Structures are given as structure tokens and as C-alpha cells.
């Protein structure tokens, strides 16, 4: 691995470059591109009896899948570190992203008949599709459950609470159904920053959009009332959607204890059903899917069946870097970090170039991130690059730099720019 760290005398800017020497020829043949298109006048109403007052809009976001082939010559050329020719990847157009604050996902028009024919989808009157909000206190396993249900890692997972900041949309599809999951931030009782307030708005927006709600609790802890979760997570909905309470981490307690806690939740909580699971090992996941499926309305899919998320690649790149920060650093530092992808360029004759900035509150946090002689940042960049390459299925050149923006977690303008006002941007 070639490493080229540089630090200025004033510590105002620090960069770390991480790249690998040998290219992997096993490129993924598909790239996902985000496009927003206006549909024709054939919008279909999607079971209006379960939409809780929502209206369908005449525009939708479609994920176009473009097949790319790589010849042996292109693979050989990709091994060269040629920085001269740089082509902007075409998912960075922020205008092509769906504004969640102005146009909730649940209001998107269904795929029309023409699109279904394009995707090889045969209309099925028994097909179910709908939205599911996954809510709960911090560190109860919401992201792990969502990843298990989708079948691959969409949300980052660490052992620290409040890792998830956005509502992450993941799609679980089969020929008979399509479940669209919202993995949400953990419910915060005492909000310390403006960021916390905006994160709770993401939770409520997910619940408003949902056909049903899955509430997670930690089975290892003493059963408590879930009113705080319902208050913050659902707000004052006039009509509550169907609710499932999931007791996660059942693998860590004895069967007899599980039965007692299950009985308590059934007696003292206002939910439709209680199911114990182990999200880590996948135990009970099929029971959760079966319950959700029984609550989803009949209708065609919202997305192509081979799509697992609508978020752009840049968003997942930023999340991977943030996950590594949570795993490597302790105390307040991970929570003070915001990760933005400044540049993502495809280079036909070289590795793709990704430039990332990590924003922190204070200069002291910046010094911790960088570490002595840049060693900590080097470790971070290397770990992030390896996971990014695994996610993209290609080799990349990753540049990481650290910047200070004081009190960014209290700056509403910056928070909205970073996507916390409800709009997932390209980061």
C-alpha cells in the first residue's frame, strides 16, 4: 500500500491517502444510477385505506441499472495510476436525488405498467408491498435486524449507541412481496444538540410513512414501558399503524426468562404482537417477516426487485468511513464527527478517486483523529478503504482529511446541508 501523509505547520489541514497496488479484476458488472422522472397520468392509488391521509404525487424516483463490461485491456489499464483523465461519476447530481422533506418516499408513485414490462415484472393481484418503520431506543439492534431482513449490510453496525443518524431505506423483495424498511436513529429522551432533534424528526417521518411499525427492545434488560419510544417515534398520529414488538438478543438469556418477559410485554404494552428474536444470528427473522407481510397492503412493487436501497453510492461510502470512526475511537469523538464525500471520480485508466472530509467540533478532536505522526488517521483510512472496495467491488484511491467547524451539531443550516433536515444528499 502506498501512503502519502501530509500535515501543515498550523494543523489546519491534514490529508491521508490510502490506495492498494494490485487491482481486482472482479468488477461488479452493474452500477446503480439515481434518476428522478415524471410519470404519466396513469398513477395508481395504492390501497388508500392504509395510507393514513397521504396522497400520491405525480413524480417518482427510479433506480436505473446500467450494465458495464470491462475488457481485459481495461482491467490492465485500471492498474495504472494515471491521474490525467478524470470523469465525474454521474450519480453526484444532487438534483437527481429525491427530497425526503418535500416528497416522502411513501408518496412516490408506483412503477407503471411500462416500467414493469421493462423489468420483466408480471402483474400479480396477490402481491403485497409497503413501508415498515423500525424504531427503538439506542443500541437495541435495529440496524442488525434490518440488515438480516434485507439479506445484506445496508446500515452500519457498531457496539456504540446512536450509530444510525439518518433513516436508512432498505428493500427486501421476493416474487410475492416487497418490504421497504426504514432503519431509524435510536430514540433520544434527552436531546443535547440540534442534531438530536433533527434525528428524532427522521424517526417520526418514518412512522408517518409506514404501513406498520416494528418496535425493538433489548431482551436482556428489565421490561419497561415503551411509551417514550411511541411518543418520540410515532408522535401524535391520529391513527396508529399496526405495531409489532420485537424482543431482540434472546440468545443472551435463558428460555424461561424469555417467556416471562414476553408475557409482561403482551400484558403491559399496546402492541399487536410480541416476537423474540436474535437479530445477530437470524433467529426469529422469518416470524417477523411473516407478521409484517400480513399487514402490508396488496399492490405492485415500488422498486425493481433487484434493488436493495435507493441511496447513492456516495452516501454508503460516507457511512462506511463513519462506521470505522465509531469502531476506532472512543468517548465523544465519534459523535462529534460528520463525514462528507467531497469528490467521487471514475478514472478509466486508474483507480476511482474518492475524497472524504471528516468534520469535527473542536481542534482537540481533530488532533485525536489524526494521532501521533498521522498514525491514527492512517489506520482509519486503510480500514475504510478496504470496506469501500468490498462494497463497490473495485479498487479505489481514498483521500481523507479532517476539518474543524465549531458547533456544527447546533448549526441548523449546516445540518440541513448535511442531510439531517429530511433530505438524503450525496454527501
Curated annotation (Swiss-Prot):
Task: Identify the residues that the record assigns to the KH type-2 domain, covering every copy.
Answer: 329-406
Ranges for the region named G4 are 248-251
Please name the HAMAP family in this protein's record: GTPase_Era (MF_00367)
Keyword Lipid metabolism appears in the UniProt entry: no
What range does the record give for the signal peptide? none
Q: Give all cystine bridges in this chain.
A: none
Keywords for the protein's UniProt record, in alphabetical order: Chloroplast, GTP-binding, Nucleotide-binding, Plastid, Ribosome biogenesis, RNA-binding, Transit peptide
Query: Its function?
Result: Nuclear genome-encoded probable GTPase involved in ribosome biogenesis in chloroplasts. Plays a role in 16S rRNA maturation in plastids and may contribute to the assembly of the small (30S) ribosomal subunit.
Subcellular location(s): the record lists:
Plastid, Chloroplast stroma, Chloroplast nucleoid
Q: What is this protein called?
A: GTPase ERA-like, chloroplastic
Segments for region (G1)? 136-143
Species name for this entry? Arabidopsis thaliana (Mouse-ear cress)
Residues annotated as binding GTP are: 136-143, 183-187, 248-251
Q: What is its main location?
A: plastid
Q: Which GO terms describe its molecular function?
A: GTP binding; mRNA binding
Q: Where is this region: G3?
A: 183-186
Residue ranges of the region described as G5: 277-279
G2: annotated segments: 162-166
Amino acid at each position: 500500500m502506498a501512503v502519502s501523509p501530509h500535515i501543515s505547520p498550523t494543523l489546519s489541514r491534514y490529508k491521508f491517502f490510502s490506495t492498494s497496488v494490485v487491482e481486482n479484476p472482479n468488477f461488479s458488472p452493474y452500477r446503480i444510477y439515481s434518476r428522478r422522472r415524471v410519470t404519466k397520468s396513469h398513477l395508481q392509488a395504492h390501497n388508500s385505506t392504509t395510507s393514513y391521509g397521504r396522497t400520491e404525487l405525480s413524480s417518482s424516483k427510479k433506480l436505473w441499472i446500467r450494465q458495464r463490461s470491462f475488457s481485459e485491456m481495461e482491467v490492465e489499464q485500471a492498474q495504472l495510476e494515471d491521474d490525467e483523465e478524470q470523469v465525474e461519476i454521474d450519480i453526484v447530481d444532487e438534483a437527481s436525488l429525491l427530497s425526503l422533506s418535500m416528497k416522502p418516499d411513501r408518496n412516490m408513485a408506483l412503477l407503471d405498467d411500462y416500467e414493469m414490462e421493462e423489468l420483466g415484472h408480471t402483474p400479480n393481484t396477490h402481491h403485497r408491498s409497503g413501508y415498515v418503520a423500525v424504531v427503538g431506543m439506542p443500541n437495541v439492534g435495529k440496524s442488525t435486524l434490518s440488515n438480516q431482513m434485507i439479506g445484506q449490510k445496508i446500515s452500519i453496525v457498531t457496539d456504540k449507541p446512536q450509530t444510525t443518524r439518518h433513516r436508512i431505506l432498505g428493500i427486501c423483495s421476493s416474487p410475492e412481496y416487497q418490504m421497504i424498511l426504514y432503519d431509524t436513529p435510536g430514540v433520544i429522551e434527552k436531546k443535547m444538540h440540534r442534531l438530536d432533534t433533527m434525528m428524532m424528526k427522521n424517526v417520526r417521518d418514518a412512522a408517518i410513512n409506514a404501513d406498520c411499525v416494528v418496535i425493538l427492545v433489548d431482551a436482556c434488560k428489565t421490561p419497561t414501558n415503551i411509551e417514550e419510544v411511541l411518543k418520540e417515534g410515532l408522535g401524535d398520529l391520529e391513527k396508529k399503524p399496526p405495531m409489532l414488538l420485537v424482543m431482540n438478543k434472546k440468545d443472551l438469556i435463558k428460555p424461561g426468562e424469555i417467556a416471562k418477559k414476553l408475557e409482561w410485554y403482551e400484558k403491559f404494552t399496546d402492541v399487536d404482537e410480541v416476537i423474540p428474536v436474535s437479530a445477530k444470528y437470524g433467529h426469529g427473522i422469518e416470524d417477523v417477516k411473516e407478521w409484517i407481510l400480513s399487514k402490508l397492503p396488496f399492490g405492485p412493487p415500488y422498486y425493481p426487485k433487484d434493488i436493495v436501497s435507493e441511496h447513492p453510492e456516495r452516501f454508503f461510502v460516507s457511512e462506511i468511513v463513519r462506521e470505522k470512526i465509531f469502531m476506532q475511537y472512543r468517548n465523544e469523538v465519534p459523535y462529534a464527527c460528520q463525514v462528507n464525500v467531497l469528490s467521487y471520480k471514475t478514472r478509466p485508466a486508474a483507480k476511482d478517486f474518492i475524497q472524504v472530509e471528516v468534520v469535527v467540533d473542536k481542534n482537540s478532536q481533530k488532533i485525536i483523529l489524526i494521532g501521533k505522526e498521522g498514525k491514527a488517521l492512517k489506520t482509519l483510512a486503510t480500514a475504510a478503504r478496504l470496506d469501500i472496495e468490498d462494497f463497490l467491488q473495485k479498487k479505489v484511491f481514498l483521500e481523507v482529511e479532517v476539518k474543524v467547524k465549531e458547533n456544527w451539531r447546533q448549526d441548523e443550516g449546516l445540518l440541513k446541508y448535511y442531510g439531517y433536515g429530511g433530505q438524503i444528499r450525496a454527501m
